[in-house]
């Protein structure tokens, strides 16, 4: 029998009441303390009804932190081998890396933070089970920016990920290791998460394909959120077909994530097969948003992008300029949502209140213990962003958050208008090539030193609108440059077909 819960004092009740917006008198606090304590004893039965339980039966082999010799780009936090020997499916023979905010039973999950060392999930994320059932061999947990907050990898508690194209430069973030692992060849396919571009940024910088599907296509059970209303799980691979195949496997409805009900509208499960019907370039109509090709784009990237567009036009594609005006303010819309949702998650000890369960109690228990100091041990970026969210919540009642959520609908409408008559929108994925290590400002504001480039300017809008987006290498010489294609909500197959067409013409 689990021991009874400890009683609380009137002072604790007064403090808790204030945090809930209650104006309690001293007499109120004493009265509520008595009634609350009288009820608390009964909750011990819940622990007995649903104990934490043992880990799933998994055969994870050789779990270890790799050496610099084994992992020259620091792409992995943990290496191991996990395969279902009885499975034979579309991913058979492929090595897969998963970002370290996705649970693998029996393997540490850090979310790129030293704060979470010691968290060992008892069961797999649903996407991990789907990978194994499809025959994949999972080879490691990929390094990432702390809490998935950062575009360069430099906030990781386990050190930055270097770029296989040039080890003096960043790999991008926050799915840093996922991009580097695919680019260096240690993985054929990788899973990442994309809240403001975190699949597409490292894919572009490392010269691989990165696909962020429509929001909700991939269920997030067993995934540690940054901002639940914007988080997407996506794929990185060396070609469009493998990225599409990965989404076919991990996508689709799961009752543990109600948002995944949308997957049935997207054709997930047939994305790779649909590539056979990718149109000729002469049948494509594309729009280039003015706002995504403005002064923030470097001359080098602009020239490479315009060359890619010229390749499409030479193959017969129609390309014209369009407008998506609100994306110019997307940074504050995105920040208002992400910072508030991060602060709220830290306050509630990352409890998945929006998921029906069942939940991995090992992760929740360890997370609660790790966060007992309310953020002590996190890096400056995570703490700064959470504090901004706390200010917006506590001093301004969350009104900026709700208005930002409303602005997402406006951005989605503008994307729909720009896409009217076009198969997809096309823009540079990133405004610059991968910066050198240490060159990018670590914070959003307030630093006088370092490169100040809005790295996620062109990627955030698709997350805010919830629409599918894919980055494909431009095919040019020099450091990698990605070309991003964006389609309408639930048009995942369409955007992948367009990407395949570009891949085909840029290879010739």
What does each model-found stretch correspond to?
Residues 1-91, 249-457, 464, 490, ...:
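Amidase signature
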Residues 105-107, 201, 219-221, 297, ...:
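Short helix/loop capping segments that flank catalytic or ligand/cofactor-binding pockets
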Residues 124-255, 464, 468-475, 479-482:
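Short glycine/serine-rich loop segments
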């Amino acid at each position: 029998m689990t021991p009874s819960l400890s009683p609380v004092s009137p002072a604790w009740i007064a403090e808790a009441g204030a945090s809930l917006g209650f104006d309690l008198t001293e007499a109120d606090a004493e009265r509520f303390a008595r009634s609350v304590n009288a009820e608390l004893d009964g909750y011990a039965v819940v622990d007995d009804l649903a104990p934490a339980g043992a880990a799933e039966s998994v055969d994870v082999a050789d779990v270890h932190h790799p050496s610099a010799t084994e992992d020259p780009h620091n792409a992995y936090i943990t290496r191991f081998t996990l395969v279902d020997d009885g499975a034979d499916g579309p991913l058979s023979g492929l090595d897969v890396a998963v970002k370290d905010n996705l649970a693998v039973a029996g393997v540490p999950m850090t979310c790129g933070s030293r704060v979470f060392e010691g968290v060992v999930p008892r069961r797999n994320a649903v996407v991990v089970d789907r990978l194994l059932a499809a025959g994949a061999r999972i080879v490691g947990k990929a390094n990432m920016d702390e809490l998935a907050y950062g575009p360069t990898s430099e906030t990781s508690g386990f050190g930055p990920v270097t770029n296989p194209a040039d080890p003096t430069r960043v790999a991008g973030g926050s799915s840093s290791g996922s991009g580097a692992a695919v680019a260096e060849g240690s993985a054929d396919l990788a899973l990442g998460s994309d809240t403001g571009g975190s699949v597409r940024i490292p894919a572009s910088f490392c010269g691989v394909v990165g696909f962020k599907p429509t929001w909700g296509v991939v269920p997030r059970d067993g995934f540690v959120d940054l901002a639940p209303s914007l988080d997407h799980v996506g794929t990185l691979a060396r070609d469009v077909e493998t990225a599409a195949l990965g989404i076919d496997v991990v996508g689709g409805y799961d009752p543990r994530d109600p948002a995944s009900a949308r997957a049935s509208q997207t054709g997930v499960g047939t994305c790779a097969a649909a590539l056979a019907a990718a149109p000729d370039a002469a049948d494509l109509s594309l729009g280039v948003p003015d706002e995504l090709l403005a002064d923030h784009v470097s001359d080098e990237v602009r020239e490479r992008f315009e060359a890619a567009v010229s390749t499409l036009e030479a193959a017969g594609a129609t390309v014209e300029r369009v407008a998506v005006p609100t994306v110019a303010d997307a940074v504050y819309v995105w920040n208002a949502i992400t910072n508030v949702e991060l602060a709220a998650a830290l306050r509630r000890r990352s409890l998945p209140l929006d998921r029906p369960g069942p939940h991995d109690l090992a992760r929740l228990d360890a997370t609660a213990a790790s966060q007992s100091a309310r953020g002590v041990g996190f890096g400056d970026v995570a703490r700064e962003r959470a504090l901004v969210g706390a200010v917006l919540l506590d001093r301004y009642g969350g009104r900026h958050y709700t208005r930002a959520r409303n602005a997402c609908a406006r951005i989605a409408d503008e994307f729909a208008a720009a896409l009217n008559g076009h198969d997809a929108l096309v823009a540079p994925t990133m405004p610059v090539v991968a910066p050198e290590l240490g060159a990018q400002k670590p914070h959003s504001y307030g630093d006088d030193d370092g490169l100040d480039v809005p790295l996620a300017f062109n990627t955030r809008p698709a997350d805010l609108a919830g629409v599918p987006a894919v980055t494909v290498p431009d095919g040019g010489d020099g450091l990698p440059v990605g070309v991003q294609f964006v389609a309408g909500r639930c048009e995942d197959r369409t955007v992948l077909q367009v990407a395949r067409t570009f891949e085909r013409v840029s290879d010739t």
